Structure formats: structure tokens, C-alpha cells
Design a protein with these regions (language model features):
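Conserved beta-strand in the GNAT
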Residues: 55, 61-70
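A short, internal acetyl-CoA/4′-phosphopantetheine-binding micro-motif in the GNAT/acyltransferase core
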Residues: 85-96
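A short helix-loop-beta-strand connector motif used in the catalytic cores of GNAT acetyltransferases and
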Residues: 42-55
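A short beta-loop-alpha structural element at the N-terminal edge
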Residues: 2-16
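A conserved beta-turn-beta hairpin within the catalytic core of GNAT-like acetyltransferases
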Residues: 73-84
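Conserved acetyl-CoA-binding loop-helix of GNAT-fold acetyltransferases
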Residues: 95-109
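Conserved GNAT-fold acetyl-CoA-binding loop/helix
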Residues: 22-42
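Conserved beta-strand-loop-alpha-helix junction that forms the acyl-donor binding cleft
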Residues: 106, 116, 120-133, 150-151
Length: 151
């Protein structure tokens, strides 16, 4: 198992993994949606070039990822935040160290970006059906809940 930064050559394998994420997220309107591969590729490019993203690779196949993008603060555009948008591990690799190793690599680099002033802070999200992961124990502060209309 290898944890490394996202590269453009990963996109096709990663799109397949993200389709698994879409199908298992527990939100009907997303699970039943039609994905637009070109849009997903553009988001991945933004994650690769203007964010911080890692993949978990096993035998040349992408089996896990943590993807993030940099976004400006609403009131202070020069203040940037790193926002995690997907953290997913293939069901056959859950229970291994892949998820923890992806998180550790992401957090370590994000902390360096924060110390250097490149970003002000970084965030992690948790879906309602995500595994129980104690972010506060890992130095994060609980700041919000999000709700979605529709099914």
C-alpha cells in the first residue's frame, strides 16, 4: 500500500472510486444522480493543482483518497482555507490502515501550509453515515452541521 499525492494519471481510476463513494453516501439525490465525468475531471484538476490531495494505491489501483480545495473566506478574500471535499476508502480496504494513513499525510502537510501562512486553517467534513472518527481528539474543533433538502 502506497500513500502519495494525487497525479493527473490517477483520474480515471479515481473517478471509478468516486462513483463508489457517490453510490454509498446515503443521500438519495446524490446516489441516483448522473455523474458528469468532465466536471469531475475539472474538480480533480483543481484538487491537484490548487488543493492538497492524496491517494491510496494498491497494485497500481487507487483504493482510497482524500481530496481538498483551497477556498477564500467570505469576508476576507486574501484569507484562504483548505476544505476537504472527499475522504473515501474502497470497502475492501476499510479496516486496514489506509484511511488513517491518508488522513495523517493530509494533516501533516496541511499543518505545514498553515504554519507557513499559505492557508489560515483546514477543515474536515463528516457525512451522516461516515465511520466514527473523533476529529476533536486529533486537534479539530467542531464548528458546524450541514443539512440538505431533498431525498
Amino acid at each position: 500500500m502506497k500513500i502519495r499525492r494525487l497525479e493527473r494519471s490517477d483520474y480515471t481510476n479515481l473517478i471509478y472510486l468516486l462513483e463508489q463513494f457517490q453510490a454509498s453516501c446515503g443521500i438519495k439525490s446524490i446516489e441516483q444522480g448522473t455523474s458528469n465525468e468532465e466536471h469531475v475531471r475539472q474538480v480533480l484538476l483543481r484538487c491537484e493543482k490548487g488543493g492538497l490531495s492524496y491517494v491510496g494505491e494498491v497494485n497500481g489501483k487507487i483504493k482510497g483518497c482524500i481530496l481538498s480545495i483551497i477556498v477564500p473566506d467570505l469576508w476576507m478574500p486574501q484569507t484562504l482555507f483548505l476544505r476537504e471535499i472527499a475522504w473515501f476508502v474502497d470497502k475492501d480496504y476499510r479496516g486496514t490502515s489506509m484511511g488513517a494513513r491518508l488522513f495523517a499525510a493530509y494533516k501533516k502537510e496541511a499543518e505545514l501550509w498553515q504554519k507557513s501562512g499559505r492557508i489560515r486553517a483546514f477543515t474536515m467534513a463528516k457525512l451522516h453515515n461516515s465511520p466514527n472518527f473523533d476529529y476533536e481528539k486529533r486537534g479539530f474543533q467542531y464548528i458546524e452541521s450541514q443539512y440538505m433538502s431533498g431525498e
